[in-house]
Curated annotation (Swiss-Prot):
Residues 172-399 form the Peptidase S1 domain. PROSITE patterns: ASX_HYDROXYL (PS00010), EGF_1 (PS00022), EGF_2 (PS01186), EGF_3 (PS50026), GLA_1 (PS00011), GLA_2 (PS50998), TRYPSIN_DOM (PS50240). Residues 87-123, 125-166 form the EGF-like domain. Belongs to the peptidase S1 family. Residues 41-86 form the Gla domain. Coiled coil: none annotated. Glycans are attached at residues 99, 230, 305, 331. The lineage of its organism: Eukaryota, Metazoa, Chordata, Craniata, Vertebrata. It comes from Mus musculus (Mouse). One of its GO terms (biological process) is proteolysis. This is Vitamin K-dependent protein Z. InterPro entries: Coagulation_fac-like_Gla_dom, EGF-like_Ca-bd_dom, EGF-like_dom, EGF-type_Asp/Asn_hydroxyl_site, GLA-like_dom_SF, GLA_domain, Pept_S1A_FX, Peptidase_S1_coag_factors. Residues 1-22 form the signal peptide. Appears to assist hemostasis by binding thrombin and promoting its association with phospholipid vesicles. Inhibits activity of the coagulation protease factor Xa in the presence of SERPINA10, calcium and phospholipids.
Amino acid sequence: MAGCILLLRGFILTLILHQVELSVFLPAPKANNVLRRWRRGSSYFLEEIFQGNLEKECYEEVCNYEEAREVFENDVITDEFWRQYGGGSPCVSQPCLNNGTCEDHIRSYSCTCSPGYEGKTCAMAKNECHLERTDGCQHFCHPGQSSYMCSCAKGYKLGKDQKSCGPSDKCACGALTSEHIRMTKSSQSQPSFPWQVRLTNSEGEDFCAGVLLQEDFVLTTAKCSLLHSNISVKANVDQRIRIKSTHVHMRYDEESGENDVSLLQLEEPLQCPSSGLPVCVPERDFAEHVLIPGTEGLLSGWMLNGTHLATTPMLLSVTQADGEECGQTLNVTVTTRTSCEKGSVVMGPWVEGSVVTREHKGTWFLTGILGSPPPPGQSQMLLLTAVPRYSMWFKQIMK
């Protein structure tokens, strides 16, 4: 009996060992599958050498943000991919700035901003001016203590929303009236702006251009204002107004041409809008960060026909040009008080006092005035005096 029991125990032990062998050693096909698997832990050195593979990293397996970054090697492209990647969390890239809190959604995210910040990614401080604001100031923006503040150009007032600007009188600057637009469309000649004027000497000869900044003040170049002692302003064919006083910029340098600006005060104001309309002078920050970059301007004025001004005003579309390139092309020094504009054609003999204006949300602003005519037939570029840099001086003289 004892022998039978021992024999039975041996048989059971043999079966157990056989099952253990089957569970430890896999059949050949399964074993081969194991051998063919990509062993990430043992291939770390190779993965660091070669750029990541998107299919292997993020589609055969679920990847993290760092692995996706290895594939694209570019933060912007990686963030865009990560927002669309089904297996990833958009919040991993920490899109919410200034200690904002990120919340994941299906293929998107939202930010809860810290106090004092706003915007999709909490990038904008509520008390600062930002170009990205779609609901910001129509004209000028100023940082405040708890919120930014808006202001308007001369002749406008803030709307109820404290952001929009509406004309408050008939001489509101840079606002083309329906009457002027109708006259422009019916004219057979090139269109002109109601703020453009010509300077005339005592013999009735036109010699320079200017621009109306206020109903009783005209901006021209210092050089033009000093050419004759008896100057009149011609706003249209029938009306000529004599100059009461001339205000040349105190730092005008005749030799270098620096600060080549002058304000001419009229003996009597022009009648708005029938005889003319002022153009708006932009604040410096608004001009240099909002108005000018990447926008198209209009060069307007008259060209020289021999030694005389042509009778028909001209217009030419221009864009801001690189200062270094402009300086090399024109062989001039571009300073903080000058700017360059580039046209689509070679510049003709534009007369001194011709101007560049830009339209912003229905209002026209003055950004440059021409001090010297360009070299004939040589370049598409012009060097102008940067008008916004003198806005405070204008206010002091015209107050």
